[in-house]
């Protein structure tokens, strides 16, 4: 077994993100897994003592193709910009049709550069859109691009074809399909991710979209929930919810009840949503989430829960072998230690300051000699 050892100033370890200082990590080059985590520094270890290691982040909801045409329609409401093939987004898909794959790829590479190693992507444009996503992420090492496709015009034959190329289905809203179509999607994608936007706007919430989704589509992943109430959260304790607070603020659709969701035991994940209006930086997303939760419940501190939502919780939902513990894939993100080591609360510091402290990310495929 060929292995390397690294010495770290600190790290967030295991499922509970336990913070431990002055450790060494040994990893198997061939298997790309962590084989041992020890206390103190190893005399043969590569010197990374000026860094704190955190596990890779997961961006659990994006529309990456939008990144091709940033800041279009800043004077237009959400309903005019996204959604069905008559929206501004689709008009720009046509204008930039030869640039979409490049735009997606840039989004993914920029994400990886700040320690986000999995991006869950709602891909529009049907089967063609999923194929563009596959093409865009080809060759990006140590990276997961989870593609949730959808059909702009429903066809059971195309639905089955989509099933063969996508990781799951990304439903724009309950109003996108008829009840029989929702049931067909559920049946065809019975063993894959079934994601759906829910109650992003007050209009959809007042139409009882959550109840209808649960009844007919039976989602395995919900997106936004901006206008859900505390009582609604009790209905979705078994369904992970991805919140995108920066997007909700930009589109003026409301502010997600983050503190209530955490206290009600909802499995919270985090996403950056539309790349045209919100950048790929998930670190900003979790910082905003923390600030919102504290405004909703003064003097609260949900930093650790929020950081878990961008890491550990997402690993479980998407079945990722990530995390800094033995037998997990060797994939870590390095943050500059100097500012963090003085922090009186390491989790709050990482959530609020991590965006500026990411130095680089390490995988077993890299040569650390």
Where are these regions (language model features)?
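C-terminal cap of metal-dependent C-N hydrolases
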Residues: 316, 326-369
């Amino acid at each position: 077994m060929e292995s390397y050892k690294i010495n770290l100033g600190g790290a967030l370890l295991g499922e509970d993100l336990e913070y431990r200082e002055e450790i060494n990590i040994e990893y198997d080059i061939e298997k790309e897994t962590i084989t041992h985590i020890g206390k103190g520094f190893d005399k043969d270890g590569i010197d990374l003592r000026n860094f704190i290691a955190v596990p890779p982040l997961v961006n659990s909801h994006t529309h990456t193709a939008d990144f091709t045409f940033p800041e279009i329609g800043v004077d237009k409401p959400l309903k005019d910009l996204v959604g069905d093939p008559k929206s501004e987004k689709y008009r720009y898909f046509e204008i930039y049709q030869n640039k979409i794959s490049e735009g997606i790829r840039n989004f993914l590479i920029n994400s990886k550069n700040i320690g986000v190693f999995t991006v869950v992507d709602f891909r529009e444009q049907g089967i063609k859109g999923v194929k563009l996503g596959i093409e865009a992420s080809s060759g990006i090492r140590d990276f997961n691009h989870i593609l949730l496709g959808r059909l702009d015009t429903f066809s059971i034959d195309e639905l089955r074809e989509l099933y063969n190329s996508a990781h799951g289905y990304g439903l724009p809203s309950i109003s996108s399909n008829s009840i029989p179509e929702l049931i067909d999607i559920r049946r065809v994608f019975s063993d894959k991710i079934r994601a759906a936007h829910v109650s992003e706007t007050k209009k959809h919430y007042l139409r009882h979209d959550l109840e209808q989704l649960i009844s007919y589509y039976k989602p395995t992943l919900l997106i936004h929930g901006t206008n859900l109430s505390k009582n609604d959260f009790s209905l979705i304790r078994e369904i992970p919810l991805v919140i995108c607070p920066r997007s909700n603020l930009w589109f003026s659709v409301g502010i997600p009840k983050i503190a209530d969701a955490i206290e009600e035991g909802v499995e919270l994940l985090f996403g950056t949503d539309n790349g045209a209006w919100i950048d790929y930086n998930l670190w900003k997303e979790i910082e905003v989430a923390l600030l919102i939760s504290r405004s909703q419940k003064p003097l609260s501190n949900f930093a650790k829960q929020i950081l878990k939502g961008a890491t550990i919780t997402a690993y479980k939902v998407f079945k990722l072998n990530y995390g800094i513990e033995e037998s997990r894939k060797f994939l870590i993100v390095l943050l500059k230690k100097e500012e963090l080591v003085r922090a009186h609360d390491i989790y709050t510091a990482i959530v609020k300051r991590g965006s500026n402290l990411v130095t680089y990310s390490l995988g077993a495929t890299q040569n650390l000699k």
